[in-house]
Regions:
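ATP-dependent small-molecule kinase phosphotransfer cores
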Residues: 33-92, 117
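P-loop (Walker A) phosphate-binding loop of NTP-binding proteins
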Residues: 8
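Hydrophobic anchor at the beta1->P-loop junction of P-loop NTPases
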Residues: 5
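ATP-binding Walker
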Residues: 11
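NTP-dependent small-molecule kinase module
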Residues: 23, 138-171
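Walker A/P-loop
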Residues: 14
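A glycine- and Lys/Arg-enriched "phosphate-lid" helix/loop adjacent to the NTP-binding pocket
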Residues: 94-139
Length: 171
């Protein structure tokens, strides 16, 4: 079983995927990390030197390879992955998808703690971040909502969320 975790930045994908990986003893694959390893560049460097179109094509290629070749893994997706090409359909066809949903307030609080490591918001004024997130969520929610399951992450620990996922999936 491939369990794909998706959601907006700050939704808890990284923390939950690590926790779930340990609980289920499934290897964890972080899609962005895999893209970075295969290109010998950080995601930021790929965007800067090769552009977003190149990145999105690589993202699709690596995603397809993982979904076609792996089994019994936790797959942590980038926040934008489900939005491009037919990625969301592919994710749903080849894995069990779980949308980690958080409120704009929660997402804002979480991403502001790591603002310098979040290229999308690094140059924004703190006061502009909630509106930026709300706009992005409005655009991305139609894709996120196609997930097999949705788990709310507000006020929950990674351990709580992982336990909820295990219960949902009956594993």
């Amino acid at each position: 079983m491939i369990i794909s975790l998706l959601g907006y930045m700050g939704s808890g994908k990284s923390h939950v995927s690590k926790n779930l990986s340990k609980k289920l003893n499934f290897p964890l694959i972080d899609l962005d990390q895999k893209i970075s390893e295969e290109n010998l560049l950080s995601i930021a460097e790929i965007f800067q030197t090769k552009g977003e179109i190149f990145f999105r094509k690589e993202e699709k290629r690596v995603l397809e390879n993982i979904l076609n070749e792996e089994k019994d893994i936790i797959l942590s997706l980038g926040g934008g992955t489900p939005v491009y090409y037919n990625n969301m359909d592919l994710i749903n066809e080849k894995s069990t998808s779980i949308f980690l949903r958080a409120s704009v307030k929660t997402l804002t609080e979480r991403v502001l703690l790591q603002k310098n490591t979040r290229p999308l918001i690094a140059k924004l004024n703190d006061d502009d971040v909630p509106e930026f997130i709300a706009k992005h969520l409005f655009e991305r929610n139609p894709f996120y909502s196609k997930s097999h399951f949705t788990v709310d992450t507000d006020s929950k620990t990674a351990n709580d969320i992982s336990a909820e996922i295990i219960k949902l999936l009956k594993i």
